[in-house]
A protein has these predicted regions:
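N-terminal membrane-targeting/pre-transmembrane regions
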Residues: 2-18, 67-171, 281
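Transmembrane alpha-helices and immediately adjacent membrane-cytoplasm interface residues
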Residues: 59-71, 179-196
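Polybasic (Lys/Arg-rich)
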Residues: 281-305
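Membrane-anchoring hydrophobic segments
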Residues: 1-76
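Hydrophobic alpha-helical transmembrane segments
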Residues: 44-59, 164-181
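Conserved beta-hairpin
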Residues: 186-232
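Lipid-exposed faces of alpha-helical membrane segments in multi-pass integral membrane proteins
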Residues: 30, 56-63, 143, 147-153, ...
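Non-transmembrane, membrane-adjacent beta-strand/coil modules in membrane-associated proteins
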Residues: 213-284
């Protein structure tokens, strides 16, 4: 009985820790592998397993939806007051990740327009800049994204010409491919403009000002940091070893694996925005820094003072 309860608790924690975008990705993979399995199964089994294999991705989505009922009820109570705009009521019915994605897209478009207009970057506070792009993979990832977007157009055009005879369908696919490539390039330009303006996180006299463009922001008072440790393993392994739930942590990194973990004091809660979604009072913050020793030294000086 205890083993069964422990298994159920573990699966429930996994559903809670997995965000909606990850769950949709898992459901898509299950669907693809299910369709591939149908080609390999004997003809006698295909009619029996076709519908169950199609239902598996839906079961993942339903399970995630059921786990989110308490959070959904809390959001609906918050917007139940009189005078709440209808747009806010409608937004409360959607998972927070979906609304955050819409906000992120708007921020990327604004960054792209600012880059086109050559607008000045917003001012950052005075202090020591902790960079994260000089030694990391940020430039490499952006270059790969630009290359992928450019190479996608001729490849999609060739595939559509070979396999699709209907001119109207080919034209629709060409437009979709062009829109996809243009969106990728717009996001790359907007993100680069905002990250370049941020320059890095800023360590002021009493706080750590986090900023990775529109993808992460927040202010952590140095007094709220209980400890700063170098991270030499995956965050999931670190959380398991220290008994910290993954959903009680937040990762602030452009694209690299975190190399620093900040342990925060529960009596001094902070709010950190990641991908336009707020995480309130996280227990730990995983960071990537080009020179993590600078942050560690500042935290130690703050604790000694």
């Amino acid at each position: 009985m205890r083993a069964r309860q422990a298994f159920f608790t573990k699966q429930l924690a996994w559903l809670q820790d997995t965000n909606w975008w990850q769950m949709l990705g898992y459901a898509w993979l299950v669907f693809i592998f299910g369709r591939f399995a149908m080609f390999l199964l004997p003809e006698a089994l295909k009619p029996l397993l076709d519908k169950p294999l199609l239902a598996l991705p839906l079961l993942l989505i339903v399970a995630k939806d059921l786990v989110g009922i308490p959070d959904f009820s809390r959001r609906m109570r918050q917007v139940a007051r009189k005078g709440t705009p209808w747009s806010e009521r409608l937004g409360a019915t959607l998972p927070p990740e979906f609304l955050a994605f819409l906000k992120l897209g708007r921020a990327m478009r604004q960054g792209f327009l600012a880059w086109v207009r050559r607008q000045p970057h917003p001012a950052r506070p005075a202090g020591a800049v902790l960079t994260y792009t000089e030694r990391g993979a940020y430039s490499t990832v952006l270059a790969f994204a630009v290359f992928s977007a450019c190479i996608e157009l001729p490849i999609d055009a060739a595939i559509a010409t070979i396999f699709i005879d209907e001119p109207r369908v080919r034209a629709i696919l060409h437009v979709c491919s062009l829109f996809s490539a243009a969106t990728i390039l717009m996001w790359v330009a907007g993100d680069r403009w905002m990250v370049r303006g941020a320059k890095g996180h800023v360590l002021t006299g009493d706080a750590l000002d986090l900023s990775i463009g529109a993808r992460a922001s927040g202010i952590i008072p140095l007094d709220a940091i209980a400890g700063c440790d170098n991270l030499t393993e995956k965050p999931d392994l670190w959380c398991k070893r220290h008994g910290v739930a993954r959903r009680d942590t937040v990762t602030v990194s452009p694209f690299d694996a975190p190399n620093v973990v900040l342990r925060l004091r529960p009596e001094a809660p902070v709010t950190i925005m990641t991908y336009q979604m707020a995480t309130q009072a996280p227990a730990c913050v995983f960071l990537y820094l080009d020179r993590p020793e600078l942050l560690g030294a500042a935290v130690r000086r703050s604790q000694e003072a």
